[in-house]
Amino acid sequence: SPYFLYRMLRRGGYGFKLYYRIGLFPIIPKKTDNKRIWIQAVSVGELSSLAKILDTLLQDPDLEIVLTGTTSTGLRMASDKYKGRVLVHGPFPLDWFWFSRLAWSRVRPDLIITVDSELWPEHFYQASLRGVPALIINARLSDNTFARLCRSSLARKLLLPKGLEILTTSERQCARWSEV
């Protein structure tokens, strides 16, 4: 909602590269035969948990990585560690239809990856519209989110599209995701 946009700008840090947040990613090189992976790691914690996987992916010359984040500290870490190694890095677009659709038209990924407990309904919707596989790595459900998803089939439908692949961190989390 406009309220959250206002809060982001007022709070500081989140207004950094606002054009990314409204889907206006910079000119991204034309799509080649290489596979393009869009990785969304919200903050320093998610980016750190993804480091080994990301470093391995970056060694493959047939892959192009678009790396996005949400927090100012996560974006700073992404810039410090991956600038020049990924195709593009910057803020994740706000999860609203127009912004997401615009970002997707520019990024054109072959796979999307999110980390931990981040559920981005519009991002996942855009993936399903385009037949792009979506993957959550280190997937976790808090007690509250688990309870809400168990109670609401609408929430499950909006947040968990068909074909979403989920890699969990424990047997308990695996059981929770399976139940949902």
Locate predicted features.
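Active-site and donor-binding regions of nucleotide-sugar-utilizing enzymes
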Residues: 5-27, 31-180
